[in-house]
UniProtKB/Swiss-Prot annotation:
Organism encoding this protein: Shewanella sediminis (strain HAW-EB3)
UniProt keyword list: Cell cycle, Cell division, Cell shape, Cell wall biogenesis/degradation, Cytoplasm, FAD, Flavoprotein, NADP, Oxidoreductase, Peptidoglycan synthesis
Protein name per its UniProtKB record: UDP-N-acetylenolpyruvoylglucosamine reductase
InterPro entries: FAD-bd_PCMH, FAD-bd_PCMH-like_sf, FAD-bd_PCMH_sub1, FAD-bd_PCMH_sub2, MurB, MurB_C, MurB_C_sf, Oxid_FAD_bind_N
EC top class named in words: oxidoreductase
GO molecular function, one term: FAD binding
The protein's role, per its UniProt record: Cell wall formation.
Entry's family note: Belongs to the MurB family.
Length: 344
């Protein structure tokens, strides 16, 4: 465990914005994570649990303790039908995908190259290319800060939805994820529902081929946060009623939407932003990415407030042009913790 006072968080957020925290504590084990978070909670001190920093937007210096989760460890067992993995919260998600592929336990390849740690995956139910975390989740282990109990919720208890979970709802602020259980079927079935993967239908595709295709597609579409600051897709794909979709498709015949089982339609937020003429739009050094409209980038010297103002500009424009409200994926962090996506 290391403790660093008044420390810059620039290396710890993928937007690369330069704000500091009052104290940065890096914890290497589950027991350290439990002890530190329990102590901060009991003393009613402000703190922020940080994984890879790929789903936050800092807008000012944080006046509290940042707890960086660095706990590592993967334990595997199996039965006749499944592989079961117990994974510590500080493991890198993409490295877990690579590990499973290298050890002949496929099933995560569609989720390749998603930045961040394993402990963050359940919070917003990460997903890409036809697969979500909930599809491979067996359980989530968390510290209940109210009573100090280490608790496991089965998949069905986690209230997963589109970029949602109980950890963003009822357990927000009173739980710290310490590990997750992954369940992968031994009878592997490729998920080829997403565009670039459809070419593999009826080809006897391998997990490695899907992995390579996903990595290639993401590298073509999404900027590398090590080179250009970003948090991946900044906006959720909005879900609207079928009647609203019919109204919009009448005005915009090329509108991209995906029918959902409950009669609603999920719109492609990237299409909305692109067709609103917002690709390349900027505020200061923050900009909408030219290749992928869902992504907001830091061209080098953007502040968190620049990115926030740009996000609000995009939301306002889409609301005016299409009557649809976009929601942000990243958490906005101010001086005293998470706050609403509003201009301050």
């Amino acid at each position: 465990m290391s403790v660093k006072p008044n420390y810059s968080l620039k290396p710890y957020n993928t937007f690369g914005v330069d704000y500091a925290c009052s104290e940065l504590i890096s914890v290497e084990t589950k027991s350290e994570l439990i002890r530190i978070c329990s102590k901060l909670f009991a003393e009613d001190k402000p703190y922020l649990v940080l994984g890879g920093g790929s789903n936050i937007l800092l807008t000012e210096n944080y006046l509290g303790t940042v707890v960086q989760v660095c706990s590592k460890g993967i334990v595997c067992h199996e039965d006749d039908e499944f592989y079961y993995l117990s994974v510590e919260a500080g493991e890198e998600w993409h490295q877990l995908v690579e590990y499973c592929l290298a050890t002949a336990m496929p099933g995560l390849e569609n989720l390749a190259l998603i930045p961040g740690t394993v402990g963050a995956a359940p919070i917003q139910n990460i997903g890409a290319y036809g697969v979500e975390f909930m599809d491979v989740c067996d359980w989530v282990e968390f510290l209940d800060l109210r009573d100090g109990a280490l608790t496991r919720y089965k998949q069905e208890e986690c209230q997963f939805g589109y970029r949602e979970s109980i950890f963003k709802g009822a357990l927000k602020g009173i739980s710290v994820i310490t590990g997750v259980g992954i369940k992968l079927a031994k009878k592997w079935r490729p998920n080829l529902s997403y565009g670039p993967l459809k070419r593999f239908e009826n080809t006897g595709v391998t997990p490695k081929e899907i992995f390579d295709c996903i990595c290639s597609t993401r590298n073509e579409k999404l900027p590398d946060p090590r080179l250009i600051g970003n948090a991946g897709s900044f906006f959720k794909n909005p879900i609207i009623s079928f009647s609203k979709f019919q109204e919009l498709i009448g005005k915009h015949p090329s509108l991209v939407g995906y029918p959902l089982p409950d009669g609603f339609v999920k719109l492609a937020a990237g299409w909305l932003i692109d067709n609103a003429g917002l690709k390349g739009a900027s505020v200061g050094d923050a900009a909408v990415h030219e290749q992928q409209a869902l992504v907001l980038i830091n061209r080098g010297q953007a502040s968190g407030k620049d990115i926030l103002k740009l996000a609000l500009k995009v939301i306002e424009t889409i609301k005016i042009q299409f009557g649809v409200t976009l929601e942000a994926e990243p958490r906005v962090i101010g001086a005293y913790g998470e706050k609403e996506l509003i201009d301050d």
